[in-house]
Amino acid sequence: MASGGSGGVSVPALWSEVNRYGQNGDFTRALKTVNKILQINKDDVTALHCKVVCLIQNGSFKEALNVINTHTKVLANNSLSFEKAYCEYRLNRIENALKTIESANQQTDKLKELYGQVLYRLERYDECLAVYRDLVRNSQDDYDEERKTNLSAVVAAQSNWEKVVPENLGLQEGTHELCYNAACALIGQGQLSQAMKILQKAEDLCRRSLSEDSDGTEEDPQAELAIIHGQMAYILQLQGRTEEALQLYNQIIKLKPTDVGLLAVIANNIITINKDQNVFDSKKKVKLTNAEGVEFKLSKKQLQAIEFNKALLAMYTNQAEQCRKISASLQSQSPEHLLPVLIQAAQLCREKQHTKAIELLQEFSDQHPENAAEIKLTMAQLKISQGNISKACLILRSIEELKHKPGMVSALVTMYSHEEDIDSAIEVFTQAIQWYQNHQPKSSAHLSLIREAANFKLKYGRKKEAISDLEQLWKQNPKDIHTLAQLISAYSLVDPEKAKALSKHLPSSDSMSLKVDVEALENSPGATYIRKKGGKVAGDSQPKEQGQGDLKKKKKKKKGKLPKNYDPKVTPDPERWLPMRERSYYRGRKKGKKKDQIGKGTQGATAGASSELDASKTVSSPPTSPRPGSAATASASTSNIIPPRHQKPAGAPATKKKQQQKKKKGGKGGW
């Protein structure tokens, strides 16, 4: 073996060492030996190539790229396009990697593999799908399973981010990775129950494969399963089972997986569950979305969703400037996106600046007419919250693509009815019916609108206007007796002769299968429980004077106990129910008898109160003109001294005891 200082070792011997170290996977020692060869011949192309490979194997991508860029002239004939592109890819210089691959002299299989990865990172899924299809079709080696996994990942990405219906590529779900990607594709199509079943299958396959792998550590199964469990929790969240989803999310976070992308997505989903509640927990979780390298692990739409939720969290926590800063940044990145401007408008509304919010929305609507419908709906909602119903109706009627929809017609008619603008409500009906007449005549929505318009006009006494609608409905269905009856009723006030003529179309009672026995109906006694609604007749209670019910009442009525000193010969005082001060014979107290009647007066008189009223105590007594609330409300004011956590109900014994003690202190006249 050549030592570091032995300069006499031959180059072939050094190459033998490099070969041996490479076969053993000891690329650190192989790199040292290659450097010795380069000291002998610094322009040795093979040695430079080996050095780049050793650096890549050791994860030193920057240093490997520097070697390639430094020796560009020497390596011109021996192209290292793959190594250079791979270093750029691992350093997240994706655009540079794409240029390197496209400028390569020869497109080898390994370059195509890398090309597919680069296209996937750039989210150019259609091109990526074509590359992987070609690789799966034309490659025959031990990496076929990995290529199929990558192919299924592209299909899942298209389904989720581009809402493309995935085509059946005939991929067998033989591994947990393939099952996981298939489930992701189903989630993008909204097939949540089926996706959950496939994820459960992926979990079983993952546990089985990891148990068979003797080289894996105990942390490997948990790391692999965390991704599957995270997707299961997401399905539970979409199904509205937020408690189960939250529990599963927190279990994954406790495992502390090393995948920063997974942690960021889970933290973001927890924040969406918390919304404006539990913001302290959301503030802790949002730190996970700021981890280093997250931007390279997630797609653009995932990163955008995280930023949206950061802006909303800032709004919920009253960080107005932070909210505006994030939403403005999002708007600059995606000027046509709705959410940033909606968040800004919501923040302005929280600050009671509704007018500015409406102006902001109107400006966005003018700049992006393709999104005007959603913006105008929000503007109308703000106008309604301000109580300006008429203006809200005008905004809603300006949405051309929605003004004929039954839901919009219903909302407009309701608001116009609230404003008592019946003419405008009828105009809304007329315009909607005319649209369906031109585009979808005789459709269910068309006939439903005509019927609702007729009912509305009849409700507000517009019988003449309702006649044309009812006639149109009756012509569509001459057997509709209900519509015919409405039409006859309307004509009876406008044209009695026409009403009489139409009444001939009504079926006779014999032809109607009502199955009513007229004689039985006339002979029936009628309602038998009418008396329940009113009071009982006096005579009804007489037969029950000695019945069982009366005995029960006698048992309930117990005679009250008489006082011990009760004298039946003495007539009770007729004014005994009045307070003493309001009785006719009350003359007030005589002077000089206060001390003798302590404890004999009305409730609430104490020694403290009597001492405060004693004018003989001039030195230690409080001022004769008490401050408001210091005399009659003395007990109430002192109770406020007790801290909130020690407060007890006013009727509690401890409170009364404390009040009495304080009143006794007051009797001494001290401050």
Curated annotation (Swiss-Prot):
Function, in words: Component of the signal recognition particle (SRP) complex, a ribonucleoprotein complex that mediates the cotranslational targeting of secretory and membrane proteins to the endoplasmic reticulum (ER). The SRP complex interacts with the signal sequence in nascent secretory and membrane proteins and directs them to the membrane of the ER. The SRP complex targets the ribosome-nascent chain complex to the SRP receptor (SR), which is anchored in the ER, where SR compaction and GTPase rearrangement drive cotranslational protein translocation into the ER.
Basic and acidic residues bias locations: 564-585
The name this protein goes by in its record: Signal recognition particle subunit SRP72
TPR repeat copies, ranges: 11-44, 109-142, 226-259, 406-439, 447-480
Keywords linked to the UniProt accession: Acetylation, Cytoplasm, Endoplasmic reticulum, Isopeptide bond, Phosphoprotein, Repeat, Ribonucleoprotein, Signal recognition particle, TPR repeat, Ubl conjugation
Required for interaction with SRP68: annotated segments: 9-163
Chain spans, region RNA-binding: 545-617
UniProt cross-link Glycyl lysine isopeptide (Lys-Gly) (interchain with G-Cter in SUMO1), position: K391
Required for the interaction with the SRP68/7SL RNA complex: region residues: 379-509
Residue(s) of cross-link: Glycyl lysine isopeptide (Lys-Gly) (interchain with G-Cter in SUMO2): K391
Region (Disordered) location: 527-671
Assembly, per entry: Heterodimer with SRP68. SRP68-SRP72 heterodimer formation is stabilized by the presence of 7SL RNA. Component of a signal recognition particle consisting of a 7SL RNA molecule of 300 nucleotides and six protein subunits: SRP72, SRP68, SRP54, SRP19, SRP14 and SRP9. Within the SRP complex, interacts with SRP68 (via C-terminus).
N-acetylalanine modification, residue list: A2
Record-level GO BP terms: SRP-dependent cotranslational protein targeting to membrane
The UniProt record lists the keyword Ribonucleoprotein: yes
Listed Low complexity bias regions: 616-639
Organism domain of life: Eukaryota
One GO MF term attached to the UniProt entry: ribosome binding
Family: Belongs to the SRP72 family.
